[in-house]
Amino acid sequence: MVETLRNPDGSWSFSYDVFDKYVEFMAENGIDRNIECFTMVPWEMKFRYFDKASGEYRFLEAPSYSSEYRELWTATLKSLKRHLQEKGWFDKSIIFMDERGLDQMLDAVSVLQEATPDFKMGLAGEYHRELVDMLYNYTLGNRCFFTAAELERRRQKGLVTLMSVSYTHLR
């Protein structure tokens, strides 16, 4: 929903027109508690952008540990934060990932904490001890559990802790 643009000088810029319309439409329909922004870590690690120099859409293939990934996402997060602050939406916005591995999550957390340390981050996925205290919103699948001490620590910090339940294994 956010259009990523590569400028002729190699810098990144972004258009929020579609994103804004979607967020406003959802708010008009009562869905306005959080804005969950997916995903810094897509399945194939390809990022679509419009290349202003060629006038064509292209893909940047950048694994989460690469300098290209860090450059793109640093620019993205800083721009997105500014935009969300201007709209008054930053405090309810969360950068979210779905079912990603520990290495990719740690890479994404590192970029986010360096670029925009006050941006909230969430994961719906497997349990990783290393992420328990890093994520604002942590939603575990139905076969994963936090320890009692981890749950209490998250509760005391005001972090969101959820469980996703799927019954597909009962078929």
Feature locations, PLM:
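Conserved small/polar residues in nucleotide/adenosyl-binding loops
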Residues: T168-H169
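Short, well-ordered secondary-structure micro-motifs within conserved domains or adaptor modules
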Residues: L131-F146
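Glycine-enriched alpha-helix->loop->beta-strand junction motifs that scaffold or abut catalytic
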Residues: T116, M134-Y138, Q156-T161
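Aromatic-lined carbohydrate-binding surfaces of glycoside hydrolases
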Residues: M1-F119, A124-L135
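Long amphipathic alpha-helical scaffold regions
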Residues: F146-E150, K157
